[in-house]
C-alpha cells in the first residue's frame, strides 16, 4: 500500500526511497515529475468516527468489535481542572492521543482514498501518517498539471466528507526537471486556489529540490546538527565540563545521525566536494570539542586519533546498511544509477540475508524453561518421562556445524552449515533438525524435551516478534509439531560435564568437518554478520586513506594506524590530560616554533635540560631530553626513544603521565 507509517517493514526510508526513485527515473529519461507535497489537516484530531467505521466495514471487521471501537471513539470524556473549577465534555471526533489503536485506525480510514488516487492515470501516491506525496511523471508538463488537479479535487472531496481538510497555502508543488527552459504552465487547482510552483519542498525531514542536487537539504541538516552541537558545547570547557568520552558519545549518537538522516537516498551527493566540506565543518567542530586540541590541528589528524570516519565514507556505510533490510523485505527497487545503485556490484554484501519483515506471534504452543544451574544437579529438568533430545551448534576454524543427540531415539546426527552462518543460527537450526527427526521417527511418547545450551536461541524462539528467517522457520516447525507433541525447550548449562550435552557438543564439532549438503546451502548470512563485514570494509578504507595523507608528519608517526581500542583509552582521560596528549601527538602544541607562529609566549630553549642549543619540540621532549631520562624510563619504558614513532606503541595514559611529570603540560 501507499501508507508507510506504523507498518512492519516500512518507514520514512521506504517512503523517501519511493519518492526519490520516481523522480530519478523520470530525470534519467529526460521527463518531468510533478509532485504535490501536502498535509491532511486534523488527521488524528478531527476525523469523524463514521469514516473509521466505514473503513472497518469495508474490511469485513466483526460487527461487535466495530461497535466497541465506535463506542470508544464517541463516548470519551475530557475533564479539565483549574483551581476549584472543573469542566467536562464529551469528545466525538478524532482518535485518542497516545492510543494504541489510533495509528491503526487512521491507516484504515485513509487507505481507501490512497488506493483510489493510485488507480489509473499513472498516479503514484506515497504517504507517511498524514503527509502525502502525489506523483505524476511524463513528457508533457501541462498534462501532468491537469491530471494533478483531478486527483487533488478527489482528495479534497474525501477530506471534507471526513471532517478533515487540505490547506493550499501549505501544499508545496514541485516540477522536477533538469531542463533550463520550461514552457508556460497553468498550475493545478486545489480548493479553488491555483497553486504555485516551488523550487523545493520539505518532505519527511529532507528538503528535496527540483534538480535533486541536495544542496538545500544539506544546509538544513548542517544547521540542525550545529544547533544540537552548540547546545552541548555550553557544558564543555578546555579543562572542565563533560569528559571526552561523553562528548564523543553525544556526537556519534545525536549530532551525526542528524547530519546523515535520510542518507540512503542522498548519498550520491557525497561525491561533491562542496557538500562534504559543509558536513566536515560540523565534524571538525565536534572533534575539537571532544579533544580540546588547538584550532590549528589538521582535520585528518583529529579524525584518525578520535577514530572518526570522514562523513563521505560514514554516509555510504550507513546507506548500504539501510538498503539491505529494505531490499530483503522487497521494499527496495535497485537501479543502475542514482541512490538505488548503492548495492550494485558490491561483493561484500550477499544477494540475500537472513533478514525478514518482522513477524509477530500471538500464541506460543510450546514451553520454554531456563532453570538455575543447581537444578541440573538433581538431573535433567522438565516433564518426567519425556523423550530427551540434546542439540548444540559450533564454529571452529570459521566452519559452522551442529549436532543432535538422543539416547532414547538412537539419534546421533551432525550437519554442516555455510561458513557465513553464526553459532546462533547453528543452535536454532539444530532445534529445527531435532523436530524433523521427530517427524520422521514419530515416537509414541507425547512429551518431548529439547535441550539447548544457548539461552539466546531459546529466548528468540519464545519472543513475540522476530526479523530472522532462521528463527521464523524454526518457530513454524515448533507450531506444527506442537499439534502432535507437548514440547518443552529447556536450557542446559554448557561446560558442566553433562554427559548428553557433551555428546551433542562433540557431534556439533564433528559437523564442522563434514561436507555441506545441498539442502543447507540456501541458509543465508545473518544481518549482524553482514553489517560487521560492511563496517570492517569501511574501516579498511579509512585506514588506507589515512596512510595516503601527505601532511600530518608527526601524527602519522605517533598514530600510524586507526585503532578503536587506543582511541577509547584516550577518551577515558580527563579533559585536560586528553588535550595534552592530543597536542603532543599532533605537534600542534604551544611550545617552540608552533607557539611562535601563533604569537603565543614560548621558551627559546628547553625548559628541562636548559641546553641553549635545544629548541622545545615534541621529538626533544619524548626522545632525547637528558633531564627527563628517569621520568621517561618510569612512564615510557626507556630512558631515551630512538624515534618519535616509538610513541605509537605507548598507551595514552602513560603518555599523559609523562607529560604531567615533565612539567610541560601547560603548553
Regions found by a protein language model. Give the residues of each.
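Short, conserved micro-motifs composed of acidic
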Residues: 83-84, 150-153, 164-199
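Conserved pre-catalytic core of RNA-dependent polymerases
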Residues: 1-100, 104, 108, 136-137
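Active-site palm subdomain of RNA-directed nucleic acid polymerases
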Residues: 1, 103-136
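Catalytic palm subdomain of template-directed nucleic-acid polymerases
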Residues: 43-60, 94, 132-157, 178, ...
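A short acidic-Thr-Gly-centered motif at the start of a beta-strand
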Residues: 17-34, 115-119, 373-385, 606-613
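RNase H-like, metal-dependent ribonuclease domains
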Residues: 178-193, 212, 217, 236-252, ...
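Inter-domain linker/hinge segments that demarcate the starts of reverse transcriptase
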Residues: 16-28, 145-162, 228, 429-436
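Short, flexible loop/turn motifs enriched in small residues
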Residues: 29, 74-75, 128, 197, ...
